[in-house]
């Protein structure tokens, strides 16, 4: 997680290595406003909070070193509770009311997918979304800057490793939304390359803490 946060922030700083003028939305003579929409409450809150804390720590270090061209970085975080409808509201608030210059560190496939139309309409960059879904990589989106591997790559490596251990009966326990289905797709593709099928598939609802029930 620390490495991912460092990469995300480094990409953001790369954006600011270019000349930034006060006339830009989210940029004043003294600060640059950056927005984050993520789960800060609910079962997935630890992911959102850790990203938020890491970004804040990195921003503090940059600001202590005179910021970006004399401007301090300010993070504005909006809670989406890991729910798509709330993510849409959060990102629109960041864009329309908070007037941020860029977005950073969203958490989750369903929430990021839901926010993409508003991101594209505003032409605002989203740096380091915490998701590996192929739907956010293909077709190419000039507003999205990824720093992590795709779920297809990750699941291929998982199945590859299990195969080296002689394990061929592989079941998939996945979240019943775009995030879980992206992971399922990756496993199915990886198994198909080895002439295998999932031994079983079981789903759990997003934000549910009852994982024992579906497995019973």
What are these regions (language model features)?
Residues 39, 80, 175:
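Cofactor-binding loop segments of dinucleotide-utilizing enzymes, especially the Rossmann-like FAD-
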Residues 31-33, 46-53, 61, 65-135, ...:
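Beta-alpha junction/loop-to-helix N-cap segments that form part of ligand/metal-binding clefts
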Residues 1-33:
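Short, low-complexity disordered leader/linker segments with a strong preference
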Residues 22-36, 67-72, 163-168:
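Immediate post-signal peptide segment of exported/extracytoplasmic ligand-binding proteins
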Residues 89, 134-135, 142-216:
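Extracellular/periplasmic Venus flytrap/periplasmic-binding protein
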Residues 38-44:
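Short glycine-rich His-centered loop
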């Amino acid at each position: 997680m620390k490495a991912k946060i460092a990469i995300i922030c480094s990409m953001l700083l790369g954006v600011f290595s270019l000349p930034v003028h006060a006339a830009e939305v989210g940029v004043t003579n003294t600060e640059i406003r950056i927005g984050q929409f993520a789960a800060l409450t609910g079962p997935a809150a630890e992911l959102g909070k850790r990203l938020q804390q890491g970004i804040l720590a990195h921003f503090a270090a940059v600001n202590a070193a005179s910021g970006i061209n004399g401007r301090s970085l300010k993070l504005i975080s909006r809670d989406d509770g890991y729910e798509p409808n709330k993510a849409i509201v959060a990102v629109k608030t960041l864009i329309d009311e908070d007037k941020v210059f860029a977005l950073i560190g969203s958490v989750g496939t369903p929430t990021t997918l839901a926010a993409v139309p508003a991101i594209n309409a505003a032409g605002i960059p989203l740096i380091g979304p915490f998701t590996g879904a192929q739907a956010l990589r293909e077709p190419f989106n000039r507003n999205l800057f990824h720093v992590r591997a795709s779920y297809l790559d990750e699941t291929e490596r998982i199945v590859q490793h299990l195969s080296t251990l002689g394990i061929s009966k592989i079941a998939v326990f996945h979240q019943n939304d775009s995030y879980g289905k992206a992971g399922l797709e990756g496993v199915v593709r990886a198994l198909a390359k080895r002439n295998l099928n999932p031994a079983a598939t079981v789903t759990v609802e997003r934000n549910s803490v009852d994982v024992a029930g579906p497995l019973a």
